[in-house]
A protein has these predicted regions:
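Glycine/threonine-rich flexible loop motifs
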Residues: 136-138
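Conserved N-terminal beta1-alpha1 strand-loop-helix module at the mouth
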Residues: 1-90, 97-124, 141-144, 151-160, ...
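Hydrophobic alpha-helix-in-membranes signature
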Residues: 129-132, 158
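A short, flexible beta-alpha/helix-coil linker loop
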Residues: 41, 132-134
Length: 208
C-alpha cells in the first residue's frame, strides 16, 4: 500500500537550531507537524541514541513520527518511526533489514537515475533535491530545480519529498510540481517561532 506522507516534513538540523532539539521537537509536533527528522553529523553514536530515544517519546506524545538521519541501527534501537539514508549510506534493503517492515525508510536522490533506482527498492518515500540553492549542507549537490520533481512524479508512485532551499514562500510551487511533501530545515530551525512557521506551512498546504 502506498504511504500517505504529511505535506510538511520537518528536519531538525543540530547546526541550525536556535534552541534545544527537545524543545523544538515538542513545539513542532504540538503545532501539527506529522513527521520530524533529526540530523546531527557531529554527535557520537551514544549521544545520538540517547537524543533519539527522548525525541521518539516527545513525538509520540503528539502523534508525530520521528525519523533518524543516516543511522538505521540507532533508529532501530531508539524505536524510531523511520530512518532516512543518503546515496553514501547503507542501501535501502539493508536499512530495511535493520529497522523492520513497519519502519519508514526514505532515500535521497539527486537525478533521474537515482530516482529510478530508488523506485526499484522497498523505500517508502523518495526525497528529491536540492530543489533550490541551499546552504544547509557544507557540500551540497547541484540544484535540480522543479523539473526533477516533475520527472520523478512520472517515474514513480512512491511519495516524493522535495528538499533543498524550500521556504514558506516557495513551498506551494513545489507541491504543485508534484511533491507530496516538502522537507524543511533552515526555514523552520532558524525561525524565531518554529511552531508558528510550521502552522503557516500547514495552512498553505490545506489550500491546495
Amino acid at each position: 500500500m502506498t504511504l500517505v506522507i504529511p505535506r510538511l516534513y520537518a528536519i531538525m538540523d543540530a547546526l541550525l537550531l536556535r534552541t534545544g532539539a527537545f524543545a523544538v521537537a515538542d513545539a513542532l509536533a504540538s503545532a501539527g507537524v506529522g513527521v520530524i527528522q533529526y540530523r546531527d553529523k557531529q554527535i557520537s553514536a551514544r549521544n545520538l541514541l540517547s537524543h533519539s530515544r527522548e525525541l521518539v517519546s516527545i513525538c509520540a506524545r503528539h502523534g508525530a513520527r520521528f525519523v533518524v538521519n543516516d543511522r538505521p541501527d540507532v533508529a532501530a534501537l531508539a524505536g524510531a518511526g523511520g530512518v532516512h539514508v543518503g546515496q553514501e549510506d547503507l542501501p535501502v534493503e539493508d536499512a530495511r533489514a535493520i529497522c523492520g517492515r513497519d519502519s519508514w525508510v526514505g532515500i535521497s536522490t539527486h537525478n533521474e537515475v537515482q530516482v529510478r533506482e530508488a523506485e526499484a527498492t522497498s523505500a517508502d518515500y523518495i526525497a528529491v533535491g536540492p530543489i533550490f540553492p541551499t546552504s544547509t549542507k557544507q557540500q551540497a549537490d547541484s540544484v535540480v530545480g522543479l523539473e526533477l520533481i516533475r520527472k520523478a512524479r512520472s517515474m514513480t508512485r512512491k511519495p516524493l519529498v522535495a528538499i533543498g532551499g524550500i521556504t514558506v514562500e516557495n513551498a506551494e510551487q513545489v507541491w504543485r510540481a508534484g511533491a507530496d511533501s516538502v522537507a524543511v530545515a533552515r526555514d523552520l530551525c532558524a525561525a524565531e517561532d518554529p511552531a508558528a512557521k510550521a502552522r503557516e506551512y500547514l495552512r498553505r498546504a490545506s489550500h491546495l
